[in-house]
Amino acid sequence: MNFIHHIALLLLSTCGICTATETEQPAAAEAPLTMDAAIEKVQFITEKKPTPNAKYYMFFYTASWCSPCRAVMPKIIDEYAKMMADEYMEVIIISFDDTVEEALAYLQKCNSPFAAVMNNSAEPGKMPGCLTDVCSVPHIVVVDSTGKFIYRGHALRYSEWKKRTTPPPSAS
């Protein structure tokens, strides 16, 4: 399965459009892509790229014009700082802004440390496969390193995604 199909299926599943039975099965000789391998092929709009080998990947669908998005961004930045201390989670922004310039200005204004892509696949530098007419903002999708869905929902349900991705207490 090529990269565009992988990301498209990930995002279609995210939006509830398809199920595992509707997806194309990889050829026997083709190994499934890990999230690291899939993300490595994405053309980001930011200089920042995701740190490889995270346990979880959070895709945060957001936009500069969305006040709930702006309200939750500081909480996500805070949690990211805590979780990245152990390389536990990587956050990738999927911007619903109209232009790359608007997206970058928003990320700079919030001091976002995240890698970012645009939601539309029509132009270079944008994330392939997102269905903008189905997805809404703010929205979060959390997957593990194999691409298995952990959480999907509204970003303001902060406690839900945090609960599902918080590392267990270390044994002393």
Show where each model-derived region lies.
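N-terminal targeting signals for export/organelle localization
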Residues: 1-40, 172
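A short beta-strand-turn-helix
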Residues: 34-57
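Conserved helix-turn-beta segment immediately C-terminal to the redox Cys motif
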Residues: 55, 73-93, 108
